Amino acid sequence: RILEIARASYRNTGFNEIGLTSLSSSDHPQILSIMDTLNREFQSRRVSIAMPSLRVNDEIKSVVTRMADVRKHGVTLAPEVATDRLRNIINKGIKDDDLYQGAHQAWKLGYTKMKLYFMMGIPSETREDLLGIVKMAERVSFERKNAGCGGLGQVKAAVSTFIPKALTPFQWHAQRRPEWVKETKKQLWDWQRLRAVKIQC
């Protein structure tokens, strides 16, 4: 069905990119075979496959490899938080190694920039959790050098303020006050050391 939609879209628009969009496309159990099928169909026409953001998991290297088959887009990854402690609290089974290996592979394939999505203001968050955002973004930047691709990679860390939602474990927690948000943004910017890394919040 996805292939049929892609064929019709290409036939009617002539666009040279097919976007696989959903809440988390990279979590689809057949994402690799879907991408392989689309690449076989469209690679000769120089039509690339793209996804808005990738969940960090053990298949991330395979996904970025398939996205690079035609042209190199910037890669967007969503680690959400930067420490194991906070991951346990929000129940995200993300491993640092998966993120760094995925970034390493992306730089090696010729990607020139990367974007990371994070949250701040999660209940019980500490200074170390916030500092971890900057450290993680810097490590991703360094992975370009580790991959033998020259200098540091251009990384943008987009940090949004956590908003407690109804019918979730955090529904009774207050949202962070504007004064806290303003001060925390300033702190993140102050921690920034590498010109190749930009903290956006």
Question: What are the roles of these predicted feature ranges?
Answer:
Residues 11, 122, 130-201:
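Auxiliary Fe-S-binding modules of radical SAM enzymes
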Residues 4-115, 120-154:
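Conserved SAM/AdoMet-binding glycine-rich loop
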Residues 1:
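Canonical Radical SAM [4Fe-4S] cluster-binding loop centered on the CxxxCxxC motif
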